[in-house]
Each structure stands twice: as C-alpha cells, then as structure tokens.
A protein has these predicted regions:
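Active-site neighborhood of phospho(di)ester-bond hydrolases with catalytic His/Asp-centered motifs
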Residues: 7-9, 33-39, 56-61, 83-85, ...
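Active-site-proximal segments of metal-dependent phosphoesterases and phosphodiesterases across multiple
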Residues: 12-15, 75-120, 150-154
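Active-site environment of divalent metal-dependent phosphoester hydrolases
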Residues: 13-16, 40-45, 62-68, 89-93, ...
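Short, flexible, glycine/charge-rich loop motifs used to bind or transfer phosphoryl groups or to couple energy/partner
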Residues: 22-26, 45-48, 71-72, 111-115, ...
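Extended active-site neighborhood of metal-dependent phosphoesterases/phosphodiesterases
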Residues: 47-82, 115
C-alpha cells in the first residue's frame, strides 16, 4: 500500500496572500498527512489544511509568534522524515539575507543547513528558499516543495509537493498550483 503525504511551505498567509489557493485541496486529494515546512504566518492556515488531512508543522523565520518547533521528525510507513524550515538560526538568517542582497545566493548552503539538522532520516523536507528542489545527498532525499505565496524573484509559480511512501521508501513529486 502506498501512503500519500502532502508537502507545503512558505504559505505566508496573510502576509503575502489573503488565503490559500483553492488548488491545494485538489493537489492534496487522498493524502493521509500534510507536512508544512514553515513560514505559515497564521494558525488559520493549519486549521484550513487540517480540513484536508492531519497537519504536522514547524516554524519558519516569519513565524515568530507561533508556538511551533523549529524542526521535528515524523515517521510514516517506516520512512523517517525530517521537517525543518531551513533558515537554521536567526544569526545565520540575517547573514544569509545580507549575502543574497549583495548578489550571493547559494542554494547549496540552504540544502546543507537542512540536511545537517537531522541524523538517521530517509527524507529531509525544507522550505525557506521559495525554490522547488529535489535531490539526493547520499541515500537521503532532500525535498523543498517551493512556495505557495508569490515571490519577488521566483518565476516557477506556486507549488506544493506529494510524497508517495511505500515500504519505507519515499518518492517525491512537485505539483504546480497554477497562477
């Protein structure tokens, strides 16, 4: 049996969006669980997602007032999934923002931060960059579903992801929500 898990990040409601796009319900049709990798901004986002499936979430750099952990591990069908936003610490966040504003964006740095957060996991899910990404570091699947909220420099459009987990092995797919 294959278990479907919805993966979402960087919703930024109501900071950048008034509400979640309606395409999320269709994208997450049939999922048993939704993992939110932070920058939620409002608990009503988790309530709305919770009408689709149970939600596990972590705090992002824009979630100062939400009482959520910065990272956690979830086990689904024998697959250990590390969930983090990916900004590491406030000090690192501000240093990286400065670097980016000076034209030194480095996706590898954020992937390293996310993967260094966990030991002994099969999948690491992160957000923060607003850039969809799917790669392996050794045997560990690194997956960033991109962002739901509009972004000032990304042209991929809003995206979420779905993990298909069978016998402890996860496959990830990116799901565009349309503009």
């Amino acid at each position: 049996m294959t278990t479907l898990v919805g993966v979402i990040a960087d919703t930024h409601v109501p900071q950048r969006l008034k509400r979640l796009p309606p395409g999320i319900a269709k994208a997450f049709d049939g999922v048993a669980l939704i993992l939110h990798a932070g920058d939620i901004n409002s608990l009503r986002v988790l309530d709305e997602l919770g009408r689709i499936a149970p939600v596990v979430a972590v705090a992002g750099n824009a979630d100062l007032w939400l009482d959520l952990p910065r990272s956690r591990i979830v086990q689904v069908e024998g697959c250990r999934i590390g969930l983090t936003h990916g900004h590491k610490s406030w000090r690192r966040y501000f240093l990286n923002k400065l670097r980016e504003n000076l034209g030194n964006y480095d996706l590898a740095r954020y992937l390293r931060y996310a993967s260094e957060t966990f030991r002994d996991v099969d999948v690491v899910i992160s957000g923060h960059t607003h850039r969809p990404h799917l790669a392996y570091r050794g045997k560990v699947l690194l997956f960033n579903p991109g962002a739901v909220a509009p972004d000032y420099y990304i042209t991929a459009g809003p995206t979420v992801g779905v993990l298909r987990i069978k016998a402890g092995v996860a496959r990830a797919e990116l799901v565009p929500l349309g503009r």
